[in-house]
Amino acid sequence: MTNQIPPSLAENQSKLKQSFVGLQMLFVAFGALVLVPLITGLDSNTALLTAGVGTLLFQFCTGKQVPIFLASSFAFIAPIQYGVQTWGIATTMGGLAFTGLVYFALSTLVKLRGAEALQRFFPPVVVGPVIIIIGMGLAPIAVDMSLGKNSAYAYNDAVLVSMVTLLTTLSVAVFAKGLMKLIPIMFGITAGYILCLFLGLINFQPVIDAPWFSLPKLTTPEFNLEAILYMLPIAIAPAVEHVGGIMAISSVTGKDFLKKPGLHRTLLGDGIATAAASLVGGPPNTTYAEVTGAVMLTRNFNPNIMTWAAVWAIAISFCGKVGAFLSTIPTIVMGGIMMLVFGSIAVVGMSTLIRGKVDVTEARNLCIISVVMTFGIGNMFVDVGNVSLKGISLCAIVAIILNLVLPKAKNEVE
């Protein structure tokens, strides 16, 4: 964490230049940021607002020491979709607001017992398969949208647009250099959108009718015990992944943010940002690896850059035409992007197992991973009174319990 890192280019920059670099950072995050609300049916302008406010809250909790940007989390896409269908948006937001308690609990655990305590309760054998289930559970949604199911798009148009979008995103991710490599989603959406224009699939009337200035669509949360219990365990995977995000930005800047301001404070900041976003109708927040990559490339280590990125996000959220334009992006374009993004989530879970050197031939690990994968892919559910546990939440609970109950192999016992 204390490698010799070249000095930040932002240290002596003027406020004006810092503001433009902040806008650049927001642009890097923009594609992924708005993708979550577009997929889940939430308001894009609200997502921009809560990303900006969430980043500022994170900076407040961490003493403005960490150059990191928080925005919409992909881990909550399936839970939000299920929640909206089951309880409606207001109750779903109420359940998501309570996920901040998971971050608070982990923050307290780290404060009292140290970061090593997370390894005991949430080792790679627990977190890895849960993340895989998050990605695999979303795969059917991506395919259905790519094929134009439940939409007015013809099959041939849907496949053409989604595949062009996917191939463009793949090409940029693999072959592009520099900052371009960090925004493959933006390039994919642009290519798919232009093709849709040629095919006559875009209706610009909502953009024409929308005002330049309008308030983001805020939602007052409602609270339901079943929704809360369903959402709480889902926060475990992104909360543990938060540690990886902080380690990454520490490596990039040459500063150990796990010690100063401390992992307990970064977890608390992420949790408060997530709860605050949900309380007004925005998707939960998480740290963005794309922005960390941009920080590495540009060597802009000054946290003020992220303050400006947050301010830009808040300012743009009040432009009605931005939200209206984003709403014109066809679902078949989103489907093409999602096939890569959701698969990537599953790969992150696999890499968690690999980096953690999890021996899948060892009976204990094999049992944990197998049960979690079967429960997740097979849509297992458990009814307890009026509460039903299913999907990612059930998988997370089962993984934690099995990890605590099943005896470790002799060579794993400390």
From Swiss-Prot:
Q: How does it sit in the membrane?
A: Multi-pass membrane protein
The UniProt entry's GO biological process terms, in alphabetical order, are: uracil import across plasma membrane
Highest rank taxon of the organism: Bacteria
Q: Report, per the Swiss-Prot or TrEMBL entry, which residue stretches are intramembrane.
A: 366-401
Q: Name one GO molecular function term.
A: uracil:monoatomic cation symporter activity
Q: Which UniProt keywords apply?
A: Cell inner membrane, Cell membrane, Membrane, Symport, Transmembrane, Transmembrane helix, Transport
Compartments, record wording: Cell inner membrane
Q: Which reaction does it catalyse?
A: uracil(in) + H(+)(in) = uracil(out) + H(+)(out)
Which segments sit on the Periplasmic face? 39-42, 83-91, 147-155, 200-224, 320-332
Q: Which residues bind uracil?
A: 74, 241, 290
Q: Which residues lie on this side of the membrane: Cytoplasmic?
A: 1-14, 63-65, 113-124, 172-178, 249-261, 299-301, 355-365, 402-414
Q: What is its main location?
A: membrane
Annotated signal sequence range: none
- Segments spanning the bilayer are 15-38, 43-62, 66-82, 92-112, 125-146, 156-171, 179-199, 225-248, 262-281, 282-298, 302-319, 333-354
Q: What's a single GO CC term here? A: plasma membrane
Checking InterPro entries in the record gives: NCS2, Xan_ur_permease
Per the entry, what this protein does is: Transport of uracil in the cell.
User: What does the similarity note say?
Assistant: Belongs to the nucleobase:cation symporter-2 (NCS2) (TC 2.A.40) family.
Q: What is this protein called?
A: Probable uracil permease
Question: Species name for this entry?
Answer: Haemophilus influenzae (strain ATCC 51907 / DSM 11121 / KW20 / Rd)
According to the entry, what is the taxonomic lineage of the organism? Answer: Bacteria, Pseudomonadati, Pseudomonadota, Gammaproteobacteria, Pasteurellales
